């Protein structure tokens, strides 16, 4: 009997971030595809370039460096992401890494502030 789409979605929804990362890698190897986000090219604007441009609405919080107090940084990462202890530790140990992606400016700034208060070096992109 074949697995239904709903069963697959339920299984993926219950996976940890590390398991999802392994799943993506397996898909890339099995099907020869890349999970990298594709750049979307918008229509060219009329006239010269708009020097100001549109304000960025989605941000990525990057952990640049864990700093001296790794335990506090791991706790902050767990609080920000909801990851388990092992996943958060692996993420901190693997810095520089993105912590949160595609979030609004307020959420990104709050996450950056928590990381910096814990002793980490973080940046917004």
UniProtKB/Swiss-Prot annotation:
Where is the region Disordered? 95-125
Pfam families assigned to the protein according to its UniProt record, in alphabetical order = Ribosomal_L12 (PF00542), Ribosomal_L12_N (PF16320)
Cite the GO molecular-function annotations of the record.
mRNA binding; structural constituent of ribosome
Note the SUPFAM superfamilies from the entry.
ClpS-like, Ribosomal protein L7/12, oligomerisation (N-terminal) domain
Domain of life, per the record? Answer: Bacteria
Q: State any GO CC term.
A: cytosolic large ribosomal subunit
Which InterPro entries does this entry report, sorted A to Z? Answer: Ribosomal_bL12 (IPR000206), Ribosomal_bL12_C (IPR013823), Ribosomal_bL12_C/ClpS-like (IPR014719), Ribosomal_bL12_oligo (IPR008932), Ribosomal_bL12_oligo_N_sf (IPR036235)
Any one GO biological process: translation
UniProt entry keywords in alphabetical sequence:
Ribonucleoprotein, Ribosomal protein
The protein's job, in short, is:
Forms part of the ribosomal stalk which helps the ribosome interact with GTP-bound translation factors. Is thus essential for accurate translation.
Write down the HAMAP family for this protein, in alphabetical order. Answer: Ribosomal_bL12
Assembly notes: Homodimer. Part of the ribosomal stalk of the 50S ribosomal subunit. Forms a multimeric L10(L12)X complex, where L10 forms an elongated spine to which 2 to 4 L12 dimers bind in a sequential fashion. Binds GTP-bound translation factors.
Which family does the UniProt entry place this protein in? Belongs to the bacterial ribosomal protein bL12 family.
> What protein does this entry describe?
Large ribosomal subunit protein bL12
User: What is the native source organism of this protein?
Assistant: Polynucleobacter necessarius subsp. necessarius (strain STIR1)
| UniProt gene name | rplL
